[in-house]
Amino acid sequence: MDELRKLLKEGKLSFQQNFIVAFELFKEMLKNDNKEILILLFINLIATFFSITGNPSLILLSRIMGAVVVIRLWMLYKKVIFKIEERQYVNDGLVIRAVILFCLEVLFIFFMTIIFLHYIFTLPEGREILLTLDYRRILFLLRVPIIIVGIIFFIGYIYILYLLPVYLSRRGSFWESVKYNLYLLKGNRIRMLIPMILFFVIEMVMVQLLLKLGILGLFINVFLETAIKVYKVITASIIYLNVEYTSQIPEEFFYLTGKEEQNSDVIEDKAEA
């Protein structure tokens, strides 16, 4: 990992370099550090199997397992970043942080659902259409609010591009992490945004194509989706560390990055000398 850290500190990586370096680390983790990846794959497979049984209880359980996958995937940020930095991985409050982020996401989805339902009920025959569960008709009725919410979500998203790796791998409160994320965004927004959009498009296209294969495609999608999501976390972690290493970090953020401790160690060494 010394060579990787050296590369990340030498200068800003190009768009292609980010993916190449991330893929090399992805291969290394598949070979030598694949426990978490296998756990994610196993949970995803079981959740997918439960979702197609038609049993309401198992379908509900599959949704819960899906939430577990998201939380564990987010926790992977710290594991990847600490692996690169060759620091001892300690799951100290990480689960709570990941759960907090997940709850915020659920709260946002719940809030948007309430808005959409209210919008439908204000339309003529909206209640009847909702009760028929005609999803195509419902989506057609919601096309305008969906576009508006999509735009709002995108605008919000471009202001939190570095929040996940920061909050899940560094110290500090949620709002301190938000502030540090905003600092890292200065001049570095596109570096994270374009790869994340690319991953999103690939996932959407892949799902649409594989679902045409029926159940077989559904399970193939589980393997590919798990691999892509892990690769996405690694790529985002690489970009984040590269930005952090090549940026002049203000003293107010030293505590988050651990530089405060490094500086104190240097002072102590000089005093002993």
What positions do the PLM features span?
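Membrane-helix interface segments in multi-pass membrane proteins
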Residues: 44-69, 88-95, 109-154, 203-229, ...
